From Swiss-Prot:
Gene source species: Arabidopsis thaliana (Mouse-ear cress)
Intervals, Extracellular compartment: 20-733
Protein's membrane topology: Single-pass type I membrane protein
Protein name according to UniProt: Receptor like protein 26
Cellular component aspect of the GO annotation: plasma membrane
Stretch forming the signal peptide: 1-19
UniProt cross-references to PROSITE patterns, sorted A to Z: LRR
Per-repeat ranges for LRR: 89-113, 115-138, 139-161, 162-185, 187-212, 214-235, 236-259, 260-281, 285-307, 308-332, 334-357, 358-381, 382-401, 402-423, 424-446, 448-471, 472-494, 495-519, 522-546, 591-615, 616-639, 640-663, 665-688
Keywords on record: Cell membrane, Glycoprotein, Leucine-rich repeat, Membrane, Receptor, Repeat, Signal, Transmembrane, Transmembrane helix
Subcellular location: Cell membrane
Gene3D superfamilies cross-referenced by the UniProt entry: Ribonuclease Inhibitor
Classification via InterPro entries: Leu-rich_rpt, Leu-rich_rpt_typical-subtyp, LRR_dom_sf
Segments in the Cytoplasmic topological domain: 755-800
Amino acid sequence: MRLHFCSLLLLYCIVFVSSFLTTDALACLPDQIQALIQFKNEFESDGCNRSDYLNGVQCDNTTGAVTKLQLPSGCFTGTLKPNSSLFELHQLRYLNLSHNNFTSSSLPSEFSNLTRLEVLSLASSSFTGQVPSSISNLILLTHLNLSHNELTGSFPPVRNLTKLSFLDLSYNQFSGAIPFDLLPTLPFLSYLDLKKNHLTGSIDVPNSSSSSKLVRLSLGFNQFEGKIIEPISKLINLNHLELASLNISHPIDLRVFAPLKSLLVFDIRQNRLLPASLSSDSEFPLSLISLILIQCDIIEFPNIFKTLQNLEHIDISNNLIKGKVPEWFWKLPRLSIANLVNNSLTGFEGSSEVLLNSSVQLLDFAYNSMTGAFPTPPLGSIYLSAWNNSFTGNIPLSICNRSSLIVLDLSYNKFTGPIPQCLSNLKVVNLRKNSLEGSIPDEFHSGAKTQTLDVGYNRLTGKLPKSLLNCSSLRFLSVDNNRIEDTFPFWLKALPNLHVLTLRSNRFFGHLSPPDRGPLAFPELRILELSDNSFTGSLPPNFFVNWKASSPKINEDGRIYMGDYKNAYYIYEDTMDLQYKGLFMEQGKVLTFYSTIDFSGNKLEGQIPESIGLLKELIALNLSNNAFTGHIPMSLANVTELESLDLSRNQLSGNIPRELGSLSFLAYISVAHNQLKGEIPQGPQFSGQAESSFEGNVGLCGLPLQGSCVAPPTKYPKEEDEEEEEDEVIEWKAVFFGYWPGLLLGLVMAHVIASFKPKWFVKILGPAKGKQVDPVRLFMNLDSRWDSFNNKDTVEEEVI
């Protein structure tokens, strides 16, 4: 009966799992399915559902054995142990565990059990330690990828892997020399990537290397010495060669690479080059389509480009090139990407239309010394960046005719005149820090593609254009440091993707609270900069309710920085000026999880809303230079990520909440020039602050202020108790000796009067009507009336 039950349970499990299997996985035997489930259960896999996991499973239709396993990226977290059920899948031919988090895991030697493996990819999976020697048993491997881990030790033992065609060991910490017989023992090797390690020594390439199948070689960012360049020049089948930052003491003569007739991509950045090898008569592979010469100490524009008519991509950024860009450069027939950033170029040879007929699509000549009018951009422009130059005059209207243009960055120049009224087709418009005038064009049509609009630090006037509501993809809007006069744009909260809104240093006015006194409730806003305007009024208690972006989350598109628009050949990242920890600074890159609010320099009043405590991911809060009153909200203690807090120059009262000491990331706090009192809380968050952070509060005391909190002198508790007891004894003695004799005399008199009943007595109390009079009650009655009589006299005296 027990055996029958177990069989039914196993059958149920198989049927249940099979319901999630793909067509390729349906052929799997029960024991293989069980091993797969056990393997999954060895790790935390909350971000991985069963169907995602099993989609990467493939079994042989004949044997039912698992032959392919490809885990989804970011699916597993945990340690890959030697006894893992993974190593029971002996028929595996393809195994890809890349982009998972196998924390604290070394590479188990049990990988050698999988002797049928042909493809093994463990890239970006947090593996550490040395590569086990047993990996040399995987003699059928054709593809081995161990890149982007923290593997150490000498070069892995791969000599026996004679079928290898792909070997990627980049971005690790391997040290020592490359085996001198590596290439002869791996005759099929076509892809070898060793960059970003600690490899040393020279490179030995045998004379027979002309028959080598190696077509892609990356050796950059290591610590080689001795012979490197000459041996590589023997690998005549190379089409992709990367030799960045080789740490060679002498300049490299590019003419050495002339034998590489098939070379297409050559990256030799961060090396010193022999100037003569950059001349137009130098022999160089004419097949080149991409040449990367970043940071090579080049001082003159390389004439070698004249002969390289197949070039599509040129990068000579971060050099020392002076003078003008020659006119012939724009006539290279296939040139589509030109990066001239960070040189000392002063302009362009030829007319202002020298670029017009160029084939260039991505053009970046930012951070140079170019002056004069801006040239007419190429007809096929996609990306155009000229920030940080000294161009003058108007922005050319020819930009409006560039239908392919996506990114336009002309910031940090000296442009004047109006903003062209044709920018809604662009994803990125950055015109920051020029001298542009007029208003922001109200020409953003329905379906506008704009994601970033930065026109800060100009001389713009008018109001914010309501047509911005058509920019449903707008993420970043900055109009800071202009002369815009308008009320707060509550209507912008209809934009579902707005992350950054910067209105600082304009002439905005009116209330910040919505007309219905409800929460502001921007759905995705993370940075709100409203400082140095004329906003007035108070903020309702629920002002910060429903700010969804204050909660931690991972970007679905994988972006790290705001405005991080990436292409294979360019990156654009939004920049902004932020006041942080008391300092005003420009942030060249702003992380997507960064969250800050700055309302400083306005005329806001009333209490700071307690709902501020709901913004748990807020990093910086600046409410200084306003007229806020009341206490510092205790709910600020819930803002656990807070690093910078500035509440200075308001009218806040009460004590500084001790709960703020629980904010472990709080590095800067200023409450200067308020009406606070009491002792400054002691703790690491407060003790490290400057005295100026608390000055201007008459009632505050304690470190870091000079004066300590001194209480009035008090007596010792024992003496106080003894004196209190003595006073109580004296008081009771006075009561006893003063009250009881009088009471006794009163009782005697009452007894006498009650016995004889004189006429005056009867007039006061009235006839007894045959009742016996109680002497005590009689005395109390007389005493009460006597008090009434005395009180009457007192009232009369007051009237007089």
